[in-house]
Amino acid sequence: MYKTKLIPVMNEDAVIVQQTDSIQDPKVTPDDTVVDSSGDVHEAIDDDVEASSPMELDSAVTNDARVLESERSEKDGVVGSEEEDEIKSEDVLIDKDDESSEVKEEEEEEDGSDDQSSELGSEADEKELDLGLKEEKKGVSDYKSLLSEFDDYVASEKMGSGVSRALSYGFEVGDLVWGKVKSHPWWPGHIFNEAFASPSVRRMRRIDHVLVAFFGDSSYGWFDPAELIPFEPNLEEKSQQTVSKHFVRAVEEAKDEASRRSALGLTCKCRNPYNFRPSNVEDYFAVDVPDYELQAVYSVDQIKNSRDKFLPAETISFVKQLALAPQECDPDSLKFMKKKAVVFAFRKSVFEEFDETYAQAFGTKSPRSSVSTLEPHNRAPPRAPLSGPLVIAETLGDLKSSKKPTKVKVSKKKDKYLLKRRDEAGDKSVQFGEIEASSEASHIQGIDGSLDGDFGLQRRAPTLQTPMKDEKSGIVSMDFASSNTAIPGKEFSASKPSLDEEKGLAEKSKERMEERAAVLPEHGKSEAMASLKPKEEAGTDLGSAGSSLQPLLESHTSASEGKSSTGSVIKKVKVAKRSSSEMSSENPPSEPKKKKKKKKEPDSDHPVKRKNLYSGEAGAKKLSQLGSAHLQTYMEADVPQLLSHLQDLSLDPFHGLSVASFGTARKFFLRFRSLNYQKSLSVSSSDATVENARDTKPSKPVKTVKRTEDPSKAGKKRLSSDRQDEIPSAKKLKKTNQLKSMASEKKIIREAKDSIKPIREPSRVVQAKPARGQTGKKTAPSVKVVEPTMLVMKFPPGTSLPSAALLKARFGRFGLLDQSAIRVFWKSSTCRVVFLYKADAQTAFRYATGNNTLFGNVNVKYFLRDVDAPKAEPREPENTKEDDEPQSQWLDQAPPLHQPTLPPPNVNLKSCLKKPVDDPSSSSNNGNGNRAAVRVKFMLGGEENSSKANTEPPQVTMTLNRNSGPSSSSSSVPMEFVSKKFQNVVHHQQLPPSTLPPILPLPPQYTKPQQLPIKPVDHVEPPMPPSRNFRGPIPAVSAGDISHQMLNLLSKCNEVVANVTGLLGYVPYHPL
């Protein structure tokens, strides 16, 4: 027999009623549901359903199929049990009475033959009814199989292994989590229900993985629950990973979701029945939480948990606390945001939703009219959760913090740099450091620490100190990585050998130390000094002092412990350096004394410097002055904390700004360093190389340079002269630091000179050329002789020239510059920079000639020229500099034309600025003096002075002697007394040598007006061969007194100088 089966179809009202019953809404009851005697739910098919489109039917059937899924499963179970009972009963009946059953079967066969016609009629009626139902529900039967398969898939997925695995790790569907995506930081997201995902997303499913939807970019991925971490406990750490706008937006969305879930517990259907709308998945609702995005999908369990988390007492306490201290709350914290969301949601649910009085009072539009509360189905989600790209989870061996991930790389580079600089001290220092680091690592295996500090601490430790320092003196101890043990929170990544291996390595290292100290004392000490110098000159004075302090402080505790043989080796040397009595009782400290005596023999040229070095006994006596009680006080204070401050400072230079007790630690280590290191600073090897390059005679010893530095800084030990060639790389690496120190010293000198003299010295005798050899023998920067030297740069024609500011930036680091003398000559493609000290100019010249890319890929030629004229004129230094460069270049190439006879330099000239016309006769005697006594050149008027120089020399200081003849060499011609205009004229004319002596007055037709404009002063002829110059006539000046012209010249100078200011960064000139 065939039974008629009606397929149940529910309308929207029925679905809403059934789903909202779980949210406790007894007001609405189903209208169209009919329950028959067997418990099956049947519903009438409305006319609207018949007229509906296939898509609407599909949605209706889908809702119906999902709602009745649980009912079907229950029915299947009941039917199955009933069938089993029937089978059992039939078996019993057959066993009891087989004969009666056979009789019944015969009777049924007879009855069947009689009623066969009636059964055929009933079957025809059933077929007709089935055909009618199929015609009424067009297309529904086509979807039945697909919907059933989909329901089965969803049911299996919901109870899949991924969800069960997530539950084992404490996660549930919908929880907020952090997931690590490849090539991205930890990203916020939430565990997404797979039933809402599209088929394309579900196809990518992995076994035992859960679907995570991320915030921000709506990306998604399949993650192992073991690789996820909770959101709220890790928010403070993970939110600081990066400042990318996408990441910040994702974190904000995650915080907003957490706040919305807090407000979800106080959201109800009292005012708006459409706040909770059923979704396509069972037990999930689309909820509209006020003040948040619409259509947030939550499960029934999430809604109940949110309601259970609401604590009225806690909410009232929060409101009271906020009222008492509104500024003490952190508005950006997640806890505050969640509590605020609860308070606002409570207010929305209890008080009037739309405040009409506010709109009336301020004349604004009523919020009630602007919000449509009865149209929930027209709302669309602002963004699909899985609309972004699929991301791949990063496989994590163990959960590590990715905060500031680039710090590890920086530490690696820094450690490689330090190891490279300190390996020249010898292989044994690195070997001992590795042994010590491995032995120390075995004692701190249980300490957890951040990965950021591992590399810096592990690899820097072997090179902080070397064992040769212990052999050199009894003060500095052998300690490589022991400072790491005093700092908790750090761990080593180095290999950890067994205890027997450590003992064997320690014994070998001890034997090698003794052999090295006994057989090669000189070599060991030299290497110790070489290893000490890069450490101190690398800018790690505090670090070196702290690391050497570590064994001193630990000697009190390690003396009684002696856990390993390595510790005993360190203990022996540490104890030796603490007092003179202990030093005299043991053998290893006695060896440094012998080495000190031997060290003085090869360096007999430096007896004074060697006296300043500490011997072992003297250092111990100096250290013993602290007293054991004094040291014990420091150790009892908190020695590990002091060492922790020191090591944090080495990793972060600004560590002391945020630590209150850092001042105490700094005083402690400075005090220790001042008691254990020499105070007299000897020049380093890089200083010696620079000074030797500055024409220093190699036979003379390098004198001690008294630097104006902090007296509390550690001393620098000078290498012996026979060992300087073994550390060439250290010299190169310290080049930058040396240049910086030179610049700072010269700045101090300049400030001191400016405070002594308000105006540049008007009368100062410039030293002659023989003084050049003395620049390398300067004993202190304060006694350096000002010897202006200019660096001339000749660029190829047609290339762009650097500006004055660029020249100042390129060469300012080499020393003090005369900024007013920097010139850029565009016509001749020449630039000029004047250094106040010749040594600085030589350093800059060597650097420029060795660097081909200083001004780009341009072939620049560099020349050094002496500027022997005094800088007494504060009014016209630029004229002085302009005359020097082309004159020196031309005089080296052209035959002498106006070289005077050089009288003895026994006249100290007076400044013509103070008395320009009072004593013209006194200046006439100096016009032809030698270049050592020449002092002034004023050529702003140009040709009027130069022309008179040829006719009436006894009247002017810048004129030539009539009786002067050509000198033997052009190199002795002074550049100071030749004017620019006269030089240019001679430069153009190029008369043959036979016409040079003597110089006679020129005919009057060659005479030119006396006054010339001032502009040509800034354009000096370039230092090029005479053949390229234009040949012009030589101007002449009529004989007579030049006092009037001199007054005009001085007045014009005053007018020019009066308008000069310091707006462009130059020092303003002082008026006359």
UniProtKB/Swiss-Prot annotation:
Reported phenotype of the disruption mutant: Delayed flowering associated with reduced H3K27me3 level on FLC. The triple mutant pdp1 pdp2 pdp3 has increased levels of FLC, MAF4 and MAF5 expression, but decreased expression of FT.
Main location: nucleus
Annotated PWWP domain residues: 173-234
Motif Nuclear localization signal 4, residue range(s) on this chain: 733-740
Motif mapping: Nuclear localization signal 3: 705-712
Biased composition (Low complexity): 25-38, 921-930
Subcellular location(s) of the protein: Nucleus
Swiss-Prot/TrEMBL GO biological process terms: epigenetic regulation of gene expression; flower development; regulation of DNA-templated transcription; regulation of photoperiodism, flowering
Biased composition (Pro residues): 897-906
Residue numbers covered by motif Nuclear localization signal 2: 596-603
PROSITE patterns: PWWP
Protein family according to the UniProt entry: Belongs to the PDP family.
Annotated protein name in UniProt: PWWP domain-containing protein 1
